Amino acid sequence: MFRVRAPWLKTLVELRQGTTQRRALHSKYRHVGFGASAQLQQSCECFIQKLNRELPRDAQLDASIDLPKKTPSYHKHLMLISPPDEAGKDPEWKGSWQAKLELNPEWPYSAIAEVKKHLKETKRGEGILINAISVMRSKSLGDPSSEKKARFLALPDMKVYEVSQSELKDFAYFVGEGMVQQPRGRAVAFADYLKGADAISKELEHREVASTAAAGMKQFAAQSYQNNLVLVCGHHQRDERCGQIAPRLIKEFEAKVEEDLDLAIVSHIGGHKFAGNVIFYKFLGFEADGKATVDSLWFGKILPSAVPTLLEHLGRNEIITPWFRGGCLLES
């Protein structure tokens, strides 16, 4: 992942080859404090001062605020891939991502609200994080085959799906692992409870949750995706801080990491006042049963001049605690 090969990259290679047991890599990292060099500290302070002169008064960067150690609770990240940028226009992440992206009526962004609505009717929809991404660099996330289809990258599934408007409901049921049925029949009576907790639990489960197989849920073909990915929050119309910092961070990552690492700008992931916000997704490989595992690391308060330091410490299996929001292991 880095131009200077590190033990961190070697571990990823071993995992892909199936020579290492599955594990949450972030739990192996050593958390360290951070005593910034005078040069880095001065560079960050100058950047913040310059940026704050360009930002509204109610959207200033404040480096003194402590970063909360909090990330969303989720088991899947579903990302709508924005169409390619058009020459002579603002990039998609700047011109097409309105403050509340799910209210955008234009295709393919209108797919977000539709999928969100139907995920509420599914077994595991509650734990699915949904965003839009604008791909800045990738050899595997090419252009869509049709403008009439929305493309979604799903992690940890490691799949790219193309979905038409008429398929959005079925797609939501597919990624949400089946539709939850409304309870039917008589109410549960006191006599049912006398049969014991196990019996009543089975009765409720039988009533409420439809089996995926029984429901005849539609399946979706997909393109395989097995890359590592860095997401930088750049939801410009929601908060200008991220919108200003994101392209600068992307430029730094492009210069400092190898070309097989995919880079994308992502819509709102929380914590705009702690911009820049960065997510590292590291593909760990497939288990014997075909399930994929992905490790995620969330960071905040990353400024362009801090990128080399962040990468240097990650290369030594170290996490700089003041910049770390949290992390988790995702399993398909």
UniProtKB/Swiss-Prot annotation:
Annotated InterPro entries: Aim32/Apd1-like (IPR009737), Thioredoxin-like_sf (IPR036249)
Domain of life: Eukaryota
Gene3D superfamilies: Glutaredoxin
Any Pfam family matching the protein: Suc_Fer-like
Sequence similarity: Belongs to the AIM32 family.
Full protein name: Altered inheritance of mitochondria protein 32
Originating species: Lachancea thermotolerans (strain ATCC 56472 / CBS 6340 / NRRL Y-8284)
Gene (name only): AIM32
